[in-house]
Amino acid sequence: MLAFNFFGATEGGLFDINATLPLMAIQVVALTYILNSLFFKPVGNVVEKREKFVSNNIIEAKNKLSEVKKLEADLLTQLQSARTEAQRIVSEAENESDKLYKEALELANNEANASKEKARLEIESQTSAARDQLSKQADDLSELIVNRLILEK
């Protein structure tokens, strides 16, 4: 008792060493064991399951993201090839349209030239026929005049 008073501790204080100290130690160990088996292990298992679930979902999301990126790249490639094909088709259609236009224009010009030439030949023919007729009428008229003059004398 003198030793405890020497350090300033009184009986029944915080640092009393008696039979309650080992009992308290056993209670702490028992409480730790009970809490560990009844609370911490199930909570730890739930946390581990949740971590596995989250980890699996993250891995699955990464896989899906990589698949989406691959599909996006494929679709962009297909889109680019479709655009190129569309441009090629439009270009071919424009070329074909120009070709048909030029052919139609050439055909129309040829028909117009043929029609113009036919009209020119017809006009020349009619002009020649009119000259011949006029020449014949002039000959007939001059013969008539000559015959009248001869008959009058």
UniProtKB/Swiss-Prot annotation:
One of its GO terms (cellular component) is plasma membrane-derived thylakoid membrane. It comes from the Bacteria. The gene is atpF2. GO terms for molecular function: proton-transporting ATP synthase activity, rotational mechanism; proton-transporting ATPase activity, rotational mechanism. The chain crosses the membrane at residues 23-40. F(1)F(0) ATP synthase produces ATP from ADP in the presence of a proton or sodium gradient. F-type ATPases consist of two structural domains, F(1) containing the extramembraneous catalytic core and F(0) containing the membrane proton channel, linked together by a central stalk and a peripheral stalk. During catalysis, ATP synthesis in the catalytic domain of F(1) is coupled via a rotary mechanism of the central stalk subunits to proton translocation. It comes from Prochlorococcus marinus (strain AS9601). F-type ATPases have 2 components, F(1) - the catalytic core - and F(0) - the membrane proton channel. F(1) has five subunits: alpha(3), beta(3), gamma(1), delta(1), epsilon(1). F(0) has four main subunits: a(1), b(1), b'(1) and c(10-14). The alpha and beta chains form an alternating ring which encloses part of the gamma chain. F(1) is attached to F(0) by a central stalk formed by the gamma and epsilon chains, while a peripheral stalk is formed by the delta, b and b' chains. NCBIfam families: PRK07353.1. InterPro entries: ATP_synth_b, ATP_synth_B-like_membr_sf, ATP_synth_b/b'su_bac/chlpt, ATP_synthase_B_chain. Belongs to the ATPase B chain family. PANTHER family: ATP SYNTHASE SUBUNIT B', CHLOROPLASTIC. Keywords: ATP synthesis, CF(0), Hydrogen ion transport, Ion transport, Membrane, Thylakoid, Transmembrane, Transmembrane helix, Transport. The keyword NAD does not apply. It is found in: Cellular thylakoid membrane. It is a single-pass membrane protein. The keyword Ion transport applies. This is ATP synthase subunit b'. Signal peptide: none annotated.
